[in-house]
Amino acid sequence: MEVFKFFDAYSIRARLFPAIIAAAPALAALTLLISWKTFGLSNLISSIGVLVLLWAIADFARTRGRAIEGTLYAEHGGMPSITMFRRSDSTIDSGSKDRYRAFLAGKLGAAAPTAEEEAADQAAADSFYGQCGNWLRQNTRDTKKFSLLFGENIAYGFRRNLLGVKVPALVLNVLIVVICVLLLWRMSWNFNASMGSEVAVVLIVAVAHAAYMLLAVSRAAVWDASKAYGRELILSCESFLAQVGTPAAKPDETKPAAKRPAAKKPASKRSKAAKPPEEP
């Protein structure tokens, strides 16, 4: 069920965490401004509301993140797992990429583009590289075996989804800051008044949160994580090549196998004309 998928490692760290960060000022306000000494109906409603809010934010972040992802690929000429396979890209050495192309061509049952073919038709070559990326993604789902790749995927998903909720989070920050300032103004900025210190804490959280969203959450950060994931995805070919290993050299089947010298046997009691037994 989709509900239980929400609690897997990727969903928690790449989808739920961005939602929690985006709603941090609101969560701080609910925690500090509502009494939790006794768990009553208002607390129950607030708790359910928070869970629903986080679910909605996580879904919105994923949708917006994917939309931003498409624009980033367009700006940089394609997915990193495609652009890094190109011969014009030096992120991964050409010798390794030649081995990866040959391996993936065998898995896909398609010929890898030569240097001349790629230079003549980059779009066709990119189509092949896109198929390579799809094959690798489908065959590297073992998060224990490909733990480094899984970590890069989570980092990319986290940054992408957090960027997706950057604008709504900043709007929420502005609203909370305005409300907190108005409340403190009505208290004559008396932090010792009832709820004065709690409102001040919420205000500080909102300001710090806004600074983080403005300075740390950016398209450049998402693209950097995307490149790290794309590089690791291509390098995962090494694991498959290690499993296959180098095939042993086969003897030349066109030449007859050399016969081993027959071992000398004691004379048989049977007639000397009898034919000696053949070797197995």
Predicted feature locations:
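N-terminal first transmembrane alpha-helix
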Residues: 1-97, 220
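Cytosolic/matrix-facing juxtamembrane and C-terminal tails of multi-pass cellular membrane proteins
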Residues: 1-15, 195-196, 212-280
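Transmembrane alpha-helical segments and their cytosolic interface motifs
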Residues: 8-23, 137-188, 196-197, 202
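Hydrophobic core of alpha-helical transmembrane segments in multi-pass integral membrane proteins
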Residues: 21-31, 177-179, 207-211
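Hydrophobic alpha-helical transmembrane segments
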Residues: 35-52, 182-209
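Structural signature of transmembrane alpha-helix termini at the membrane-water interface
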Residues: 56, 60, 64, 68, ...
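Charge-rich cytosolic interhelical loops and cytosolic tails of multi-pass membrane proteins
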Residues: 69-148
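Juxtamembrane membrane-interface segments of multi-pass membrane proteins
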Residues: 134-137, 143-160, 224-247
